[in-house]
Amino acid sequence: MSGNTLGTLFCVTNFGESHGPAIGCVIDGCPPGMELSEADIQADLDRRRPGTSRHVTQRNEPDAVEILSGVYEGKTTGTPIALLIRNTDQRSKDYGNIAQSFRPGHADYAYWHKYGLRDPRGGGRSSARLTAPTVAAGAVAKKWLAEKYGTRFRACMTQLGELPIPFENWEHVPHNPFFAPVADVQAYEDYMDALRKSGDSCGARIRVQATSVPVGLGEPLYDKLDADIAHVMMGLNAVKGVEIGAGFASVAQRGTTHGDSLTPTGFASNNAGGVLGGISTGQDIEVSLAIKPTSSIISPRESIDIHGQSTEVITKGRHDPCVGIRAAPIAEALLALVIMDHALRHRAQCGDVVQAVAPIPAVRLG
Amino acid sequence: MSGNTLGTLFCVTNFGESHGPAIGCVIDGCPPGMELSEADIQADLDRRRPGTSRHVTQRNEPDAVEILSGVYEGKTTGTPIALLIRNTDQRSKDYGNIAQSFRPGHADYAYWHKYGLRDPRGGGRSSARLTAPTVAAGAVAKKWLAEKYGTRFRACMTQLGELPIPFENWEHVPHNPFFAPVADVQAYEDYMDALRKSGDSCGARIRVQATSVPVGLGEPLYDKLDADIAHVMMGLNAVKGVEIGAGFASVAQRGTTHGDSLTPTGFASNNAGGVLGGISTGQDIEVSLAIKPTSSIISPRESIDIHGQSTEVITKGRHDPCVGIRAAPIAEALLALVIMDHALRHRAQCGDVVQAVAPIPAVRLG
Amino acid sequence: MSGNTLGTLFCVTNFGESHGPAIGCVIDGCPPGMELSEADIQADLDRRRPGTSRHVTQRNEPDAVEILSGVYEGKTTGTPIALLIRNTDQRSKDYGNIAQSFRPGHADYAYWHKYGLRDPRGGGRSSARLTAPTVAAGAVAKKWLAEKYGTRFRACMTQLGELPIPFENWEHVPHNPFFAPVADVQAYEDYMDALRKSGDSCGARIRVQATSVPVGLGEPLYDKLDADIAHVMMGLNAVKGVEIGAGFASVAQRGTTHGDSLTPTGFASNNAGGVLGGISTGQDIEVSLAIKPTSSIISPRESIDIHGQSTEVITKGRHDPCVGIRAAPIAEALLALVIMDHALRHRAQCGDVVQAVAPIPAVRLG
Amino acid sequence: MSGNTLGTLFCVTNFGESHGPAIGCVIDGCPPGMELSEADIQADLDRRRPGTSRHVTQRNEPDAVEILSGVYEGKTTGTPIALLIRNTDQRSKDYGNIAQSFRPGHADYAYWHKYGLRDPRGGGRSSARLTAPTVAAGAVAKKWLAEKYGTRFRACMTQLGELPIPFENWEHVPHNPFFAPVADVQAYEDYMDALRKSGDSCGARIRVQATSVPVGLGEPLYDKLDADIAHVMMGLNAVKGVEIGAGFASVAQRGTTHGDSLTPTGFASNNAGGVLGGISTGQDIEVSLAIKPTSSIISPRESIDIHGQSTEVITKGRHDPCVGIRAAPIAEALLALVIMDHALRHRAQCGDVVQAVAPIPAVRLG
């Protein structure tokens, strides 16, 4: 398996390149009988779409999704759901100047060595554009989980470059271009404007959360729920770190502090991030991601060409100066796909899953 | 699949419980013709073994491995290698008092809800004892990778509780009970003695490294090398965070800093941690883990019993006050299993892999 | 996994319905660097295409394939190859009269019970139309195997209803509408004309052969080469029996007859059909299939409706009176996909495969 | 994957060699809470065991199974069930004379070419002895299916060499050494005695049946129920042909005959063998197998040695002159494993399965 399929029971097979004719995916294993239309999927695609603010790539892609199969008379049939998104705004000429050399921090060096060739148009297969089909598939998973268990997914930015973003309220997230949980984002607007002007890029930290997750999801020994979450999150372009619950802070915690006390009305804290022994506890799943700065920048960088000779690389074209900005809806989709897969795996072995244990106290990280 | 198999081509299927008659694994997909004996495996098992210092559990297990199949006249045959380790020092009575209640931070709550029952003897299947077969399988992978590519694995502790451990030299690691890369470990001895006396536990941070890794390993889109590394590492008992290369520090880096420059003699830095676009670059693979404090502690904790009633839990028995101490050889094994699997996947699709790109400059993290 | 992906390393994920907007597949795992164009695939699709003689369905589908991804500058890149075939000649109204009842011998009864709904348009997902993407994927496998090992695939009809078709020569196969290895097909033309007039359908027997197959392909214990061949062949619509080599005739053979003698110049016979112990021997792979008569016939049949009430069913629409007629190119494709997958599996574990053992004597079945 | 794991959700990983220290398997995915003991498994192992009549190999193996894991207080826990069978009656010296040459019709030629070596002791991994762990795993599946759905499995011999065995009654099967459904087996006793005396071997035909199979099992497109049945059956040692329902007889049937009429009280016939469109219909599953004559015979055969030189081979040692005789319980186990896997797959995607449609008329093949 060449790694383009995600999931064991709710399987998403992704295809396409940034500058090819189309991208898309095939979802295999969706339960039959769920109402599904393009509109259900388009909403999340629009949240991820480029060109929506001056802080992201100006490539203009409507990312309109077409359902090719698996839905009959408005309902899923249980057969593969093929989703197609045509590429419409490729400008391959922008990439001509980097076809013979390698961008520092970019996948093109590794692709060249692995396959003996590479598609330099927009990064080809390594482009973050390929997260669009993942988001589309995630929308299907979200809908099923919401209808079946009331599970919800949300994500926000908690740090932009060196600026921490305090958590005020989830309500602010949809109202600013940064997916920031704060009312006033002027500081981040200014930061990004200065960054763009400098020709550089920056990293970001993203928090992802799932609520009303059924208890009992996750397969020990190796396919633990948190292991599979780490897999999808680290596999997202530019991610260099993943935390569950207290994450790296747990290193300096004592056992008497870290272990979340249980009470007759629920857990007293959530250092576990909703997972114990690799299995969901019914608490909120809490994940945090470190996203590195974009490698495609206009500032000149020292590098080599395909013949191993020293050269200088400048990446023109339309790139996100902070890929973390658009990562929130993608991270939600990835978390939904993992939970969906484990929901099906659970009912295969253990029968239908139990609803989230109630009441779960509102103790949350950050 | 219930999650007890790791890998797609070099497949390890793990079985057993902490206090059952035996634990073990079946390795399927090992190339034929490699010399292999129990001694090749025992060395790593001995590094992970309990009872080797006063800072780890005093359970006395020789962890002697028996090869049941897959080796003929001292060589692997290409058929499944079954490895068996008999349990010899179970004391199930130690666990009687916790069979009816849940330990805060422990898997038993989740197992109970998932399966409708649990094996309370030593945590049953959720016990860290089940890492022994993983270490055994990892030893087989290490041997093949060393012979074929010269790949080497090592790990050390970089933080114990709130005490950071500076990096002095890899040579110190085998000479102290903490896998610490320092000459003088008195501070850590004292720290652990005080911790044990207090009846509490602490976390740790572990660094894992692979050198001479062939370039080109890793399968985009979803089964990237770093994604699969994150999967196995987060799946290790008690791990709450995983970083590749610069990890969470990359959030505050600029693109001009983070992206490792390429020069005719190699990369100028290793913020990437040896992976670009999910594919190995030939640089050292660098991984860092956050390990939470042990949940099984002697200090009384607030909890509930299986009927949902309030209770107090004290965990007697023999437990590691810092599970991170024995994590180093396990983390090495997990990294070896991932790289082995991707080496086979690579040669399936692309033919035999290229040796590590040379020369690789000695730039390393930390 | 819902069963729409074939193969473990050369993976084909099939999607679409007979009367939806499109059908297609995603091939994951194709080695990089092979020249590939739509023309390479179209040739086999044209051999399978409906409407090419009066003996097959008169549905007029050009089955024009579009490569959506995985090919750059005329060469495979090692990333997923998505193939799209638009449906152009659906006439859903033809099926209105059977939406409320079940055709004897047809999948619609089983689909109804499995999914709680069904797509009655042309059989939806159960239609033989879904073999088109399989044929397209098989063409890619055939090309790689031919270039790498010189492996070739061919199939012919050996029985039509109760009429055995003697084997004269492979050269005749492309020159008649039955894929029959004989020069004179008048008897079969007459037979089919009479059958159509009677409103009935008939079965067929198909022989499939691969030549110049490398020795050593196949994974014991469970994924033997012949086991995987039986899997794909029995999974082909309407197939009720599969034989390898001597097949059912071997029941009455003695060991002294059945076991193919080995001589310094090759095997003396091929009762094994090219497989011993589940592993290819370098001899020709020989497979035989039993294909049942089409269930969609115009003759009235006793049946029940979806409420369990007695009814009579007549299937109008455009159907193949003998689905076996178009089965030859599909069976070739299926055999190619199995051998391709095992070629990649073999080189993953054992390194690159050995060429077919030469000389292979020309002893062939029937 | 090297092919030693069967199933996608109820996964059986098989290990061991005929003359190694032990054979066994790991079952992953068994639902928790089912009562299980060694006795539940031993019964089927005893039916398959060698040495039970003069017509089978005289190797004396008790085949005593030990449960190493996955069962706690007499119930399955949902974690891997490891089963171990020690080999006790190996006589490796019997095989010394064939280590340097290849037996016609035997796997050793293919193993040699695949792996570059082979284990000549009793055929090593290719030995029919490795069906014992499969039978053990099948016993677990049978128990779960019987308790959950009332599904039952049985198999009998329908032809021995050139002697057809008429079907009288299933009740006779356990009362003769041939698993023959007839009261008087004198003819078969005589046939086998003469065969043994002649130093030759013969084939057999086996019928396998599952009753009370839930409707809706099977995953189109590729993992159809009949496809997966064909996979396991063709993968059984010595099998050269597989039929479902009417099998090869369907070639000469007309559609008006083959398609089983539906009536308000059930199907009027069972040419389909219980599967339509790859999905179970609730009718009995009917399978037929062709088993070739044993290749290990005492009569001298023309062959080559490992240097390609002409030689003569005589196989001493203890072999079954008709491996089909012990195939009945193995075929039952294989069918049970496939149905078990699909039962779990079905409830993953579609929720819990429906009971077998009743009443199913008693129309049965042959």
Swiss-Prot record, chains A, B, C, D:
EC numbers: 4.2.3.5
Pathway: Metabolic intermediate biosynthesis; chorismate biosynthesis; chorismate from D-erythrose 4-phosphate and phosphoenolpyruvate: step 7/7
Signal sequence extent: none
Binding site for NADP(+): R48, R54
Gene3D superfamilies: Chorismate synthase AroC (3.60.150.10)
GO BP terms: amino acid biosynthetic process; aromatic amino acid family biosynthetic process; chorismate biosynthetic process
Cell wall biogenesis/degradation keyword on record: no
SUPFAM superfamilies: Chorismate synthase, AroC
GO cellular component: cytosol
Listed CDD domains: Chorismate_synthase
Bound cofactor: record note: Reduced FMN (FMNH(2)).
Subunit structure: Homotetramer.
Name of the protein this chain belongs to: Chorismate synthase
Annotated source species: Acidovorax ebreus (strain TPSY) (Diaphorobacter sp. (strain TPSY))
